């Protein structure tokens, strides 16, 4: 299963991916968000989290965030994750695979960190080994018992402060 997922997600353009235990993610969510999540994905067991890098581009083009200069990333991520979702639906025909990116009842950064996709930065963003925090997160929530990739612990950055120093919000 991991080999298939690695192949599919690499083809989709993900720089990192992992699978978090749904119960561990639900445990940190407030009751209303947990209820919404379980309405959308009954029998939730796992969250497949994938990080997709975005171009850093030319920072001299004005005060517009780099990610906002291209096509809407929600559409891009949905398109990139469709082959992954279809393959999983074929492999697990009785299970739901619900796509989320940003607009989600799940704490996606927490889930991705729990899955081992990256470390949690002091700025609250996920920091991946190859793209830093310049990533978009996509999640497939499912009742399928995919193998969990994380060890159940959140890795945090070493506290160098670089993310805070370079944060445009101060």
Regions found by a protein language model. Give the residues of each.
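Iron-sulfur cluster-binding cysteine motifs and their immediate structural context
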Residues: 162-170
């Amino acid at each position: 299963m991991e080999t298939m997922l690695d192949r599919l997600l690499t083809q989709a353009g993900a720089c990192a991916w992992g699978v978090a235990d749904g119960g561990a993610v639900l445990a940190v969510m407030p009751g209303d968000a947990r209820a919404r999540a379980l309405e959308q994905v009954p029998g939730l067991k796992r969250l497949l989290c994938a990080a997709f890098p975005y171009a850093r581009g030319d920072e001299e083009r004005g005060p517009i965030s780099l990610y906002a200069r291209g096509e809407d990333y929600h559409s891009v991520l949905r398109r990139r994750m469709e082959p992954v979702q279809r393959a999983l639906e074929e492999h697990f025909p009785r299970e739901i695979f619900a796509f989320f990116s940003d607009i989600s009842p799940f704490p996606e950064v927490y889930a991705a960190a729990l899955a081992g996709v990256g470390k949690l930065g002091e700025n609250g963003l996920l920091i991946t080994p190859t793209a830093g925090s310049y990533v978009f997160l996509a999640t497939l929530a499912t009742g399928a018992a995919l193998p969990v990739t994380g060890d159940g612990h959140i890795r945090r950055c070493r506290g160098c402060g670089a993310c805070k120093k370079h944060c445009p919000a101060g």
